[in-house]
């Protein structure tokens, strides 16, 4: 249960902290774009011209516009600002950043 969050939380937190523009694909195929303002166990607050509350169960993929370092394995001052989250069926993908960058 907590194992899934050990990847999701640092990834979303790095995107939020570095204000990386993201594309969020929903399970119905809709693409949302903006910056992650905040998140919790169930929702992501996405800011563009307006703020949108996006439920995580509706998200298929989160694609950053540029690579982001979300692991503190190389100890470059990894922060421990973990949110308390339960498990989610979200399918985040950090390796698709070159999908639409042409």
Swiss-Prot record:
Region described as Disordered: spans on this chain: 63-102
Bias-annotated ranges (Polar residues): 70-96
One cellular component (GO) term of this entry: cytosol
Keyword Calcium: no
Oligomer and partners: Homohexamer.
Primary role: RNA chaperone that binds small regulatory RNA (sRNAs) and mRNAs to facilitate mRNA translational regulation in response to envelope stress, environmental stress and changes in metabolite concentrations. Also binds with high specificity to tRNAs.
Protein name: RNA-binding protein Hfq
Upper taxonomic lineage: Bacteria, Pseudomonadati, Pseudomonadota, Gammaproteobacteria, Enterobacterales
This protein's encoding gene: hfq
């Amino acid at each position: 249960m907590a194992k899934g969050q050990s990847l999701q939380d640092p990834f979303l937190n790095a995107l939020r902290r570095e204000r990386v523009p993201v594309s969020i694909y929903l399970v119905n195929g809709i693409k949302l774009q903006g910056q992650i303002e905040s998140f919790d166990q169930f929702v992501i607050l996405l800011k563009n011209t307006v703020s949108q509350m996006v439920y995580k169960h509706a998200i298929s993929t989160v694609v950053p516009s540029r690579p982001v370092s979300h692991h503190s394995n190389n100890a470059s001052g990894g922060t421990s600002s973990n949110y308390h989250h339960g498990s989610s069926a979200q399918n985040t993908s950090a390796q698709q950043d070159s999908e639409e960058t042409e």
